[in-house]
């Protein structure tokens, strides 16, 4: 068998017969988050067009993950949206990548926080979700259709919406929004602070996502630290190990260890 035949045999595919012809279905390609440990656990990144929930208490590690996700998109010239109530995490990106980075600030004091610009949308708050949907639709229509598969968005307002609108209304809004984002070619990370909500509220929201990533606090040899784990990722391969996020040196060692794991360290849900 030739090398070309070997390579073709190894390609993951779903085949069916249509008018005597075999069709090959492409698997979901990964979109790198830019956060090395997370990309390693995900075996490359988040599958394109997936919606993933990031549950985390307020911490530097969560902020860094969000920042890397946004920076990676902007630096790669990929359409990148950031929906937030406090824009300091990515203010420089809005200024430096005005053609591909779009900021949506849901804050009544937004105009005092950030100068107006064509790529910055300032809304009164999270109370009127219709206004946010209109702003997202307006910005999406400005994007290059050829970049549909590499678009990314971070929704950093879920906990605010959930506390303001309640589980029923938030779930209804998210069902519509996530469907629209997927059809528009966006890969989504939605940030939720689990400490602010009841288990019932969390379940009502988390069940809408195809994947779930969790950052928790726990003890390390050096004291309290943060740990990252992929809780689920629908029908995708990922490492089930929990990674420690405390200290750059420890992160480097953890990343090296994860990359050296053999196949028993992987989990596939089918």
Please tell me what each predicted stretch does.
Residues 112-182:
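Phosphate-binding/switch loop-helix module in NTP-utilizing enzymes
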Residues 79, 149-152, 183-191:
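Loop/turn-to-beta-strand initiation segments
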Residues 192-260:
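Phosphate-binding/switch region of NTP-binding enzymes
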Residues 86-89, 185-187, 191-197:
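Short beta-alpha junction loops
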Residues 2-26, 236-270:
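C-terminal regions of RecA-like/P-loop NTPase motor modules
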Residues 86-130:
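Nucleotide-state-sensitive switch-loop elements of NTP-binding domains
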Residues 30-87:
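Glycine-rich P-loop/Walker A and Walker A-like loops and their local beta1-loop-alpha1 context
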């Amino acid at each position: 068998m030739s090398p070309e035949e070997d390579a073709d045999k190894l390609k993951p595919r779903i085949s069916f017969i249509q008018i005597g012809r075999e069709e090959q279905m492409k698997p979901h390609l990964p979109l790198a988050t830019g956060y090395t440990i997370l990309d390693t656990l995900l075996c490359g990144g988040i599958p394109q067009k997936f919606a993933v929930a990031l549950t985390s208490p307020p911490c530097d590690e969560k902020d860094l993950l969000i920042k890397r996700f946004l920076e990676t998109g902007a630096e790669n010239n990929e359409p990148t949206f950031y929906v937030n109530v406090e824009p300091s995490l990515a203010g420089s990106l809005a200024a430096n990548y005005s053609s591909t980075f779009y900021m949506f600030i849901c804050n009544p004091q937004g105009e005092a926080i950030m100068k107006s610009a064509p790529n910055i949308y300032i809304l009164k708050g999270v109370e009127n979700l219709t206004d946010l949907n209109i702003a997202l639709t307006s910005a999406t229509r400005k994007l290059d259709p050829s970049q549909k598969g590499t678009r990314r968005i971070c929704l950093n307002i879920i906990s605010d919406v959930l506390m303001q609108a309640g589980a029923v209304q938030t779930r209804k809004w998210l069902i519509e929004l996530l469907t629209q984002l997927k059809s528009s070619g966006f890969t989504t990370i939605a940030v939720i602070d689990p400490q602010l909500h009841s288990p019932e509220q969390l379940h009502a929201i988390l069940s809408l996502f195809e994947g779930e990533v969790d950052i928790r606090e726990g003890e390390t040899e050096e004291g309290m630290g943060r740990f990252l784990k992929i809780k689920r990722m629908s029908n995708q391969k990922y490492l089930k190990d929990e990674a420690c996020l405390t200290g750059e040196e420890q992160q480097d060692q953890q990343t090296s260890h994860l990359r050296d794991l053999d196949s028993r360290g992987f989990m596939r849900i089918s």
